[in-house]
From Swiss-Prot:
EC class (word): translocase
Gene Ontology MF annotations: ADP binding; ATP binding; proton-transporting ATP synthase activity, rotational mechanism
Full protein name: ATP synthase subunit alpha, chloroplastic
Protein species of origin: Galdieria sulphuraria (Red alga)
Listed Gene3D superfamilies: 2.40.30.20, ATP synthase alpha/beta chain, C-terminal domain, P-loop containing nucleotide triphosphate hydrolases
Similarity comment text for this entry: Belongs to the ATPase alpha/beta chains family.
Keywords associated with the record: ATP synthesis, ATP-binding, CF(1), Chloroplast, Hydrogen ion transport, Ion transport, Membrane, Nucleotide-binding, Plastid, Thylakoid, Translocase, Transport
Lineage, highest ranks first: Eukaryota, Rhodophyta, Bangiophyceae, Galdieriales, Galdieriaceae
Length: 505
């Protein structure tokens, strides 16, 4: 029989008592009154903050959006099927935040920063709030550097600068996402971090974007934030803010960033759904009264910081989908008034084979021209005016039977300029080659080229300049303007290519 030694037992008990630390945890706990459609009403959380994260019994997280006298309206960031009436809800004392860091580059994450690409979860040491205040006036500087999209029509007539907000607006299937992806692909070797926020899209569309970027070698400097169509409205609502927070991390490190929100129409619809379920009073088109603030607080986070803060920038390209070209609807007019210009894509132009289908007449850039390189200003100054005059003349010529020679020449040149600006998908053009293309069109070198052969001639000219006249590219890169030596080389290149091209026809 084992001997019991009371003195040893009492010593052990005394030791345990001495080491025992009392830890009292206080947490505010409420009760679910009602749940359904991704919304829960909770009673008893009297000290909860607006936007605070709440934890339900099944570990589902929600955001407190409505703070009322007798209950709190919570939007759920997960499935509500396991949440029952009467179940407890804990307040966490935290506001929504995500991990941020270089580890996210090349990854696909959800609106909460969790990996959804099947790879290892990124491990980051830093967190950042999803909702951050936009930089103030003093810490900003005016837009002074260009952000080249690689699309000739945009870089010449609707230029975008680093730190600008440029809206891409148009009907469905007019090439809005293609412009955004071309811009990402064109940032290769430009030291620009790109973030693509896919809001309310099909998972297959997001997979296609990922494969395109991977194929073009652009995924390494890109982060994709996806809140797919089958995810709760709350995740579609916060996805753009998550993308902005990831971009801000790099911006405050002195880097240039580009954020694409594809698209904000779906975010507004998700917010409308949440607001109506929370019984907020509906306004125009049933959107809540603060839908303008929804987009303004997001887009104001785009900025070009001053040199004291490292000179980083966040350029925003929000996308808005219109119905039958109606830019005067509620959400389009809101976002047009917030941004620094818009690129309007027309379904009529798209269907008539003009791609990218940019309507130059109503597309503008309010600040980007200040950041355009001098060489582009020199050659593209007249381009927008010539195209506008051509569009007017073309409409008039449909009713006129006989036109004088000058009008016929103007129409012929306009058709060639329009042909010159056509560009295939996922093939951005470097700015030096764009200058050569526009110079040849504006100065009448394309007038003798048959209309259907213009694209072949431009391809031949680009190849000739890259392979045989690389000094032209070096001169533009170093001087940023079309010096007389570069112009002479360009004229010679165009004439030599033209002679060879016309001889082979």
């Amino acid at each position: 029989m084992v001997n019991i030694r009371p003195d040893e037992i009492s010593t052990i008990i005394k030791e345990q008592i001495e080491k025992y630390e009392t830890e009292v945890r206080f947490s505010a706990v409420g009760t679910v009154l009602q749940v359904g459609h991704g919304i829960a009403r909770v009673y008893g959380l009297e000290e909860v903050m607006a936007g605070e994260l709440l934890e339900f019994e099944d570990k589902t997280i929600g955001i407190a959006l409505n703070l009322e006298n007798d209950n709190v309206g919570v939007v759920l960031m997960g499935d509500d099927s396991n949440i029952l009436e009467g179940s407890p809800v804990k307040s966490t004392g935290k506001i929504a935040e995500i991990p941020v860091g270089e580890e996210f580059l090349g990854r696909v994450v959800n609106a909460l920063g969790k990996s959804i690409d099947g790879k290892v979860e990124p491990v980051c040491s830093e967190n950042r709030l999803i909702e951050m205040l936009a930089p103030g006036i003093i810490v900003r500087q005016s837009v002074c550097e260009p952000l080249q999209t690689g699309i000739t029509a945009i870089d010449s007539m609707i230029p975008i600068g680093r730190g600008q907000r440029e809206l891409i607006i148009g009907d469905r299937q007019t090439g809005k996402t293609s412009i955004a992806l071309d811009t990402i692909i064109n940032q290769k070797d430009q030291d620009v971090i790109c973030i693509y926020a896919a809001i309310g899209q099909k998972a297959s569309s997001v997979a296609q974007v990922v494969s395109t970027l991977e194929e073009k070698g652009a995924l390494g400097y890109t982060i994709i934030v996806a809140a797919n169509a089958d995810e709760p409205a709350s995740l579609q609502y916060i996805a753009p803010y998550t993308a902005a927070s990831l971009a801000e991390y790099f911006m405050y490190k002195g880097k240039a960033t580009l954020v694409i929100y594809d698209d904000l129409t779906k975010q507004a619809q998700a917010y409308r759904q949440m607001s109506l379920l929370l019984r907020r009073p509906p306004g125009r088109e049933a959107y809540p009264g603060d839908v303008f603030y929804l987009h303004s607080r997001l887009l104001e986070r785009a900025a070009k910081l001053n040199q004291k803060l490292g000179g980083g920038s966040m350029t925003a390209l929000p996308i808005i989908e219109t119905q039958a070209g109606d830019v005067s609807a509620y959400i389009p007019t809101n976002v047009i008034s917030i941004t620094d210009g818009q690129i309007f894509l027309s379904s009529d132009l798209f269907n008539s084979g003009i791609r990218p289908a940019i309507n130059v007449g109503i597309s503008v850039s309010r600040v980007g021209s200040a950041a355009q390189i001098k060489a582009m200003k020199q050659v593209a100054g007249k381009l927008k005016l010539e195209l506008a005059q051509f569009a007017e003349l073309e409409a008039f010529s449909q009713f006129a039977s006989d036109l004088d020679k000058a009008t016929q020449n103007q129409l012929a040149r306009g058709q060639r300029l329009r042909e010159m600006l056509k560009q295939s998908q996922n093939s951005p053009i470097p700015v030096e080659e764009q200058i050569a293309i526009i110079y040849s069109g504006i100065n009448g070198y394309l007038d003798e080229i048959p209309l259907q052969k213009v694209s072949s001639f431009i391809k031949a000219l680009r190849e000739y300049i890259v392979n045989s006249k690389s000094k032209f590219i070096e001169l533009i890169k170093s001087n940023k303007q079309l010096v007389s030596e570069a112009e002479e080389i360009l004229k010679q290149s165009i004439q030599e290519t033209k002679a060879t091209f016309l001889a082979s026809e």
